[in-house]
A protein has these predicted regions:
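Conserved alpha/beta-hydrolase "acid-adjacent" motif
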Residues: 242-251
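Short amphipathic alpha-helix adjacent to the substrate-entry channel of hydrolases
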Residues: 80-99
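Short beta-strand/loop motif that positions the catalytic acidic residue
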Residues: 235-237, 241
Length: 302
C-alpha cells in the first residue's frame, strides 16, 4: 500500500482535528463538499444523468474498485455526485479506483421505479466494459452508498435473486459481494414510515405501483427481501444520524444475519449523517478503514 507523504499526512490529521472541533457536519457542510476532477466521464445511457465518473490512481494497477452511489433522498435537490468527488479523490490517493455513479432520480424523467434500478444495472455493465480499457481489478469491488445510495448499493448486492419475471431482472449482473452502506435506508418495506419522515418519499416513487403481474412491489426493489445474497455488508452510521439512526443499521444487520449473510454494524461516535461521507470529516479514518477492509487492503479492526 502506498504511504502518504509526511506533509500530506500531517495536513489530513490537522483537517480531522479542526473538523472534530467544529462539531458534526450539517447539510450546508455536505453541500459545500468538493473534490478533484475525474479521470474520465463516461455515459452509460442517453439521459443527462446517465453517466459515471472514473477516478484512476497513479501507477500501473490493476486497481481495486470502489463503486460510489450518492444519496439525496432519491432527488436531485441535494446534489450528490459532485459531493462524492471529495471521497473519490481521497480513495484514489490510496490506490483505489473509483466509479462514481450518477443516476435518474424521482424528480427526473425516467427516474424512480424502474429507471434508477435499471441505471444501476447499466452503470455496472459500463464499469465491466471499462475494465478492458483501464487496469481495473473487478475481482475486488466494493459498492459504497450514502443514504438513498445505501439503499441502491444494498439492492445491487441482491440483484441475482431478482425473479426472472421482474422488469428489473438482469441475466448476468456483475458480482459485487462487498457492500458499505453509509447511513443507508435499504429496507423499503420495514422503514417506509422513516423514509417518508426523513425524505418525503413514498412507496410508489421508489418501488412502483402494484399490478396483477407484480402484486408485491418489494419483491424486486427491497434489499431486505433479496436476502441471503452472499455478500458481506458493513452498515456504517453516525451516532447522531437523525436521517437513518443507528437502530436502522442494527435492524438490517439482524435480518441479514438471520438469512445467513455476514453483516457488521459500525457506529461513528459524535458523527452526523453527513460526516459518514466526507473525507474531510473527523470520522473519515474509520470509514476509510472499513472500505479498505472490504477490499481486503486492511486487517479487521479489533
Amino acid at each position: 500500500m502506498r504511504l502518504l507523504p509526511a506533509a500530506l499526512l500531517l495536513s489530513a490529521l490537522l483537517s480531522a482535528f479542526h473538523a472534530r472541533a467544529a462539531g458534526p457536519m450539517k447539510l450546508a457542510d455536505y453541500l459545500a463538499l468538493e473534490g478533484p476532477a475525474p479521470s474520465a466521464k463516461i455515459a452509460y445511457g442517453a439521459a443527462l444523468s446517465q453517466y459515471a465518473e472514473l477516478f484512476l490512481p497513479q501507477g500501473t494497477g490493476p486497481f481495486p474498485v470502489a463503486v460510489l452511489v450518492h444519496g439525496g433522498c432519491w432527488t436531485s435537490k441535494f446534489g450528490g455526485i459532485g459531493q462524492l468527488r471529495n471521497m473519490a479523490g481521497a480513495l484514489a490517493a490510496r490506490g483505489i479506483a473509483v466509479w462514481n455513479v450518477e443516476y435518474r432520480r424521482v424528480d427526473e424523467e425516467g427516474g424512480g421505479y424502474p429507471g434508477m434500478y435499471l441505471d444501476m444495472h447499466a452503470a455496472l455493465d459500463a464499469l465491466r466494459a471499462q475494465a478492458g480499457r483501464h487496469p481495473l481489478d473487478l475481482a475486488r469491488i466494493v459498492a459504497v452508498g450514502h443514504s438513498a445510495g445505501g439503499q441502491l448499493v444494498q439492492w445491487i448486492a441482491g440483484r441475482a435473486r431478482i425473479p426472472a419475471t421482474s422488469p428489473l431482472h438482469h441475466p448476468q449482473p456483475l458480482p459485487v459481494r462487498a457492500i458499505v452502506s453509509l447511513g443507508g435506508l435499504a429496507d423499503l418495506r420495514g422503514e417506509a414510515a422513516l423514509i417518508q419522515k426523513s425524505c418525503g418519499r413514498d412507496t410508489v416513487q421508489l418501488a412502483g405501483s402494484p399490478s396483477a403481474a407484480r402484486p408485491d412491489v418489494f419483491a424486486d426493489t427491497n434489499a431486505a427481501e433479496l436476502l441471503p445474497n452472499g455478500s458481506r455488508t458493513w452498515l456504517v452510521t453516525g451516532e447522531l444520524d437523525t436521517i437513518s439512526p443507528p437502530r436502522v443499521a442494527h435492524d438490517y444487520a439482524s435480518k441479514a444475519r438471520a438469512a445467513g449473510d455476514v453483516a457488521e454494524v459500525v457506529i461513528l461516535p459524535g458523527a452526523s449523517h453527513y460526516d459518514e461521507v466526507a473525507a474531510t470529516s473527523f470520522a473519515w479514518p474509520r470509514v476509510l478503514q472499513v472500505i479498505e477492509q472490504a477490499l481486503e487492503l486492511a486487517p479487521p479492526r479489533p
